[in-house]
Amino acid sequence: MKLDGKTIYAQSSDIKSRTYLEYRKDMKKKAIAEVEVIDWLRDKIKELYPNKHIKVYKSGGDKFLWFLRKGGITREPDFIAEIDDEKIEFEFQYAEKENLDFYDFKVSKVVKKKNKKVIPTEGKLFIYIHKPSLKYAIFKPNWILKNAKYGMVEAWRSYAYRVPKEKFEKLLKPDPTLKNLCKNIDVKNFVLNFQHSLIDINKEKLSYLFQSVVDENKIVKIIPKDLDSFFKICFILDNLNKIPKNANLWLVYLLSYINKNISLENISKIVYCIDFLYSKIELKSNELIQLVSKSKELMETINAYYQKDGSYRSSLTISPLEETRHALFSINILEDLIQDMIFYYSKNYPDILSEVKPIKKIYENIKNIEKTYEFIKRGCKL
């Protein structure tokens, strides 16, 4: 991946203990909130700027990405608001916990250096939502600079501007419309955690493979002969941080396992392997065409297994709860894949990706997320 000046890249120590999927899960928590909040933010900006033409969007527009292949965070603002002919950047933060002693803000978001002086960033506002109290605040970087202390944030392992609780919470305003917004965020984070637990389940099932002696040089060369072997080998290589030889060929071969009658469990194995291989290679046009087509086919097959109670079912031998986990895991990866292809390949292959719809909200491909959420909650209590 080509490096760019607007990205702060993670140190290897930040992500080496996590697989790529685990890193993306962590990145997706804030992304869920960001894409859910856009409509609400637009309404708030309209209140601030009445009788103005307002347009609000994520940085990058339809091509925005909630994770980077090599780790790290972008320097781009979270949102851009076009207010008539003026553009204002918005940085978004939210608190999930009560009784915080400090509210922390990254230095690079608050100030910039000019003529060796530190000055507050212009043309930018902060939007902060305090979920426990259903309150929010909109303020300028200059307010942070005036009210914050400069100190170490252990969780970030870096220095930041820290606004004491007693000062910050005076800014917060109640808003009853935050109730539904925060509920939607909580539901999607619940689904995120539920589907991702499939990784831990598979680690437990396949732990015996990690305990045996593995010839790493041999395992990266041989193309597996069936889907189950494909999944096991990709899972091992992913956790060993190894890349197979001829990974492009592996991907094409893997896509041949996709058919209309495939079970949800096997779909989850396929999308895991696709995701693992895809992140390690550069696709040629014919491979991209196949992947776009097969991704669409997989999503349609998953949707066909949706039930009226919010579950997904394709088998009589696997519990509906576990089948639903497989379905949600697959939807999660396929949405990532769709957005990644748009982000990285639409410039060079616009014709191939012209019919691919960008992901507007995370988990938008779950037919009725409220029903699915309630089904999972009931199933987890049994």
Where do the protein language model's features map onto the residues?
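HEAT/HEAT-like alpha-solenoid repeats
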Residues: 255-260, 300-313
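Hydrophobic residues embedded in beta-strands of well-ordered beta-sheets
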Residues: 87, 134-137, 218-220, 310-312
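An alpha-helical repeat/solenoid feature that recognizes helix-turn-helix modules
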Residues: 188, 220-245, 259-289, 313-340, ...
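Class I S-adenosyl-L-methionine
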Residues: 39-42, 234, 303, 377
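Buried hydrophobic core positions in alpha-solenoid tandem helical repeats
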Residues: 195-198, 202, 206-210, 250-255, ...
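Nucleic-acid endonuclease domains
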Residues: 1-196
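Acidic surface patches and DE-rich sequence motifs
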Residues: 83, 130, 215, 259, ...
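Short sequence/structural elements of tandem HEAT/ARM alpha-solenoid repeats
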Residues: 244-252, 286-297, 340-347
